Amino acid sequence: MQLVHGGDWAGYRAEFGRDPLDFSANVSPLGLPEGVARAITAALPTADRYPDPLCRELRAKLALHEGVPAEQILCGNGAADLIFRLVWAKKPRRALVTAPTFAEYATALESVGCTVERFFLREQEDFAVTDAFCAAIRPGVDMVFLCQPNNPTGQLAALPLVEQILRRCAACGTLLVVDECFLDFLPDHALHTAKGLLGEGNLVILKAFTKLYGMAGVRLGYA
C-alpha cells in the first residue's frame, strides 16, 4: 500500500513547473517558528546518531505542557503515524467514524481489514456532531474516531457531549480516539480539550506540531 499524507506539492511542481497554492493541509501560514529553526540547526551535529527511541526528554517536556504523566505520552512521526500504529496495535474488527471527516482514519482501519461504519452528519444541522452519534455506538464497535474540531467541517462537539460519547463507548467496550490536532487554533482551546477525561481509561487523544506550529516537514505528533 502506498500511503500519501499531505499535499503532493512536489508532484505538482514536477508536472507544471511551478509551486501550487496548497490549501489541502491546513498548516499555519506563519511558517516554522524561529526558535524551532534554531533548535534544528543546533541539533545537526548529532544527526549521525539515532534519536532516543523513547523520546524521554521530549515526553518529559510534553508532560509538563499538557499536565499529564510522561508515561501516558507516546510520540510518533506526526499524528497520522500514530493513527496507523494505534489501529495496527488494536486491530479493531468494526469501527465508527463521522462523515465527512479526516480520510486517514478509514484508510488506517481498512488496512487491517476493519469494517468502517460512517455516521453521516446532516447538512441541516450544519454538519455538527449531536447526541444522535451516541446511538450509533454499540457493542461490537471496537473503536470510534472523533475529530475535534472536525476536519473538514470545522465543527466542534461540546465537551459535555464528548463526555457522553466517551461513557457510551465505555459501556460498549469501545476505545474512543479524539483527534485534537486543530484544537489549539481556538483561543479558548483549554475549555474544549478532553484531557480531563483521560482517567476513564478508554480514551486516546491525538495531537501534533504539524498544523499550529507550521512543522509539517518535521513529522512530530503525540498521543
How should each PLM-predicted stretch be described?
Residues 1-49, 174:
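N-terminal "arm"/small-domain region of PLP-dependent enzymes with the aminotransferase-like
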Residues 21, 74, 94-96:
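Conserved beta-strand elements of the Class I
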Residues 26-29, 79-80, 102, 148-152, ...:
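Short glycine-rich anion-binding loops that position phosphate/pyrophosphate groups of nucleotides
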Residues 31-33, 54, 202-223:
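PLP-dependent aminotransferase class I/II
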Residues 51, 63-85:
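Short loop-beta-helix segment that forms the pyridoxal 5′-phosphate
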Residues 88-146:
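PLP-dependent aminotransferase-like
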Residues 110, 127-140, 152-176, 180-215:
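Active-site pre-lysine segment of PLP-dependent enzymes
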